[in-house]
Amino acid sequence: MKKLLIIALMMMLSMSDMALGKVNPDQAPDEEEAEIGNFDFIYGPQSNQNEAFERTEMLMSEAFSHLGTRYRSGAKGPSAFDCSGFTSYVYKQMTDVFIGASSRDQYARNTPITRAELQCGDLVFFTSPRSGRNVGHVGIVVDVDPVTQNFTFIHASTNSGVKISNSTDSGYAKRYVGARRIQL
């Protein structure tokens, strides 16, 4: 009985080693190398998502580093910004991509997206008191509520300089025009 128990225990340990990949006498060295060389899970679509996440994280870090910077009409940074100067400066610093000089130019030249498609790093556009129904203000999306589609954004405000606002704030809720994505 003891012998049978010992044999059964040894077989179980042997099987657990095979299941963990420790021992497999039938596996040829070529198969083992092919298995080791298969890094598709690293370099496949997931890797692209990781790169996009890192780019967005760096973009937002650059944007946040300017919180509190004063507003000045026509200023392109880094000591002062207007709204489009802020967005173009942040994108130029982090991606070396020119997204347009004015809020209207940025709205016209970048890829349109719906509010439901908003992601961190997208540009959001609003009218301004002087622009009538036309685009007159721009910011960069910080966060989006997928249920309500409300979002927070960082922008250069005429009264407060670079700050974070919410799309539900009374000054922005009715002025939203649309959103654009920067193709990197």
Regions found by a protein language model. Give the residues of each.
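N-terminal targeting signals for Sec/Tat export/insertion, comprising classic cleavable signal peptides
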Residues: 30-61, 65, 72, 76
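Catalytic cysteine-centered active-site loop
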Residues: 49, 69-120
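Residue-level detector of flexible, active-site-proximal loop/helix-junction positions
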Residues: 11, 78, 106, 160, ...
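N-terminal signal peptide c-region/cleavage motif recognized by signal peptidases
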Residues: 14-16
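Aromatic- and glycine-rich peptidoglycan recognition patches
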Residues: 4-7, 18-34, 38-39, 48, ...
